[in-house]
Amino acid sequence: MRENIGVIWLREDFRLLRNYALINANKNHKKLIAVYAYKEKKFIDKKGQKWWVYKSLKNFKKDLDDYNITLQVIKTDTYKSFFEKLIKIKNISLYWNRIYEPAYLTFDKYLEKKLKFHKIDYKIFKGNVLNEFNDVKKNDNTPFKVFTPFWRVAEKIHIEKVPSPDTKI
């Protein structure tokens, strides 16, 4: 168990089961903090989304409290400014689940470079997908172009990896 603090960056994954960032941080750290970076500009014209995030965070906080994990919602203008502050805290390990939209993937690459430069431990896990992009390939190691053969292989891989439904952090 590491003495430093495990920080789980919450993005769109407010669940305990199969939340690989949360599960791995919990295995490796005595103290955990879950952080949601709230960008107010993101929700200006999206009252429904804002309501959903509020309710989801409120419910998720109750779940995290059962495991003595603190949830902090931090208001920020940009993810960059949020992480500039976070990087100044040296005694942390950062965990998050990937989001597969281009802007998020680009930011993840930027953040990885920053964290490496500042020698901050981090781990990224698959998000809300059954398989990562490169997990499912044909025998010749090239990507599938037809769905049915892809699904047969993906299903086989997924069935082998599924944890028990009663597995909790």
Identify the role of each PLM range:
Residues 1-159:
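Trp/Phe/Arg-rich N-terminal binding region typifying the photolyase-homology
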Residues 161-169:
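Substrate/cofactor-recognition hotspot
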